[in-house]
Amino acid sequence: MIKLYGIGLSFNVSKVRYCLNYLNLKYDWAQTNPIAGENQSAEFLNICPTGKIPAIEIDGLKLFESNSINRYLATINHSPIYPQDAKKRAIVDAWMDYVAIHVAHALGRVLFNRMFAPMTGQKVDQESIRVGLEFLDKYFPILEKQLSQNPYLAGKEFSLADINLLAILDPCELAQISIDRYPSLKKWRSGLQSQPFYQKCYKDYSQFVLDAVNAKAGK
């Protein structure tokens, strides 16, 4: 039995959902909304001591952190999206970490201040937006170069690194971040968004988020 805790708006949760879908694994969905404080309940903290989403229960194992969850899922299912070969696996790990540590952090700065801060009545930090965009102007060309030379982020084969980046880029339109200057990155993204593992979650991520926000506001 697999039980996933999270919220549909989170790109880190999306990472795990894409992985589960790609591996054709059935799971129970436990809506856990941090904005409502549901991640601080005693029940959830017993699953995830850090109080962060996503978290997962699988055959008695309680696990958190999206990258760790996906690595575990791919490993126990002997999937090539997380290679057995140590060298190939290291390359996948390197790109997974690059996306999670650098790209996600920079994009998150912009997304929070352009969308979630105004939505929740918090102060918008224009300097944080500037810094985030400045970093993305450094990071996107690196991704563009890699994807202009390879069909996938870690090389010739689709991997967890692609799932990571695909999920991280989901909020680009909401954050008013364009990747039009990066044709290889844009083509790669469009190709994966048409795949069943993605479509099972979202036909259109931006519209999904806007619908959720409008529903909450009673519009």
Protein language model features and the residues they cover:
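Active-site-flanking alpha-helical
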Residues: 74, 168-169, 202
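Conserved beta-strand edge residues that scaffold enzyme active sites
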Residues: 34-35, 161, 206
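GST-like domain detector, emphasizing the conserved glutathione-binding G-site
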Residues: 1-130, 219
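Acidic/histidine-enriched, glycine/proline-rich intrinsically disordered or flexible terminal extensions
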Residues: 205-219
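GST-like fold's C-terminal all-alpha helical module
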Residues: 99-194
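Generic structural signal for helix capping and beta-alpha/helix-loop junctions
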Residues: 14, 37, 189, 209-210
